[in-house]
Design a protein with these regions (language model features):
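Mature, function-bearing regions of proteins
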Residues: 1-234
Length: 234
């Protein structure tokens, strides 16, 4: 799976797609009280060291933010400037997905899906290989795949810093679990890279593509050290 820049509308994840993904999860999970993964999973091992999830959240935010759909979708939103509340909300959601029981994980996923379903608009400028005026929606599958990618790659990398290198067998298991994790977003697993090596090639391709070009609006946003941010940083 290689990075591409699209000039046409991509597949949008709708509520029936999410329902179908949730049905797949319910069919696959044998111990719903243990959630999507369970205590014997590589995922549980990876998220156990305390620094891993917080550091993943920070890196994922930096990797996601330049994408035009995300940069302009958050323009004017409190989430683009009120960093600490957003960080706490994200951490709560991820721990629900990684460690809570299945019903809690699905409920949180549905809430996040509902929030993202409201985010859409037209690009105010040509950027990242997309045309000015092109309609965007936060729940487009190609964007969600990139968001998913920015979560699972830093998780592995930070775990290997704090917990030790994963064996090739564990990497394979981890990626299988990550493909299951994608169902929480309503992503069709057939659209994902087939294995970890293909995933890394996809990730590197997107990271090096025009999609990661930074808009002037994004570059000039206030940051937590700029003195221009309202809310809990002040």
């Amino acid at each position: 799976m290689t990075a591409t820049v699209h000039a046409t509308q991509e597949r949008v994840i709708a509520r029936p797609d999410l329902d179908q993904s949730f049905a797949q999860l319910r069919a696959e999970v044998t111990r719903p009280e243990h959630g999507v993964f369970g205590p014997d999973s590589v995922m549980w091992r990876i998220v156990t060291p305390i620094p891993v999830v917080p550091m993943m959240l920070m890196e994922a935010g930096l990797l996601e933010a330049p994408h035009p759909w995300i940069a302009f979708g958050t323009m004017g939103s409190k989430s683009s400037t009120e960093f600490l509340p957003r960080f706490h909300r994200s951490a709560d959601a991820f721990y629900d997905w990684f460690c809570a029981d299945l019903d809690t994980a699905l409920r949180t996923a549905r809430r996040v899906f509902g929030y993202h379903s409201q985010i859409q608009g037209e690009l105010p400028e040509a950027i990242g290989g997309y045309d000015a005026g092109q309609h965007y929606m936060a729940n487009q599958q190609d964007v969600l795949i990139w968001v998913w990618a920015t979560i699972i790659k830093p998780l592995k990398e930070y775990y290997e810093v704090f917990g030790g290198r994963l064996s090739s067998a564990d990497v394979d298991r981890y990626y299988d679990e990550c493909r299951r994790f994608a169902l929480l977003f309503g992503i069709d697993r057939a659209a994902l890279p087939a294995d970890w090596d293909a995933f890394v090639a996809y990730f590197d391709g997107v990271a090096a593509s025009p999609v990661m070009d930074l808009s002037e609006e994004f570059l000039n946003r206030p940051g937590p050290l700029s003195g221009d941010v309202s809310g809990p940083w002040r």
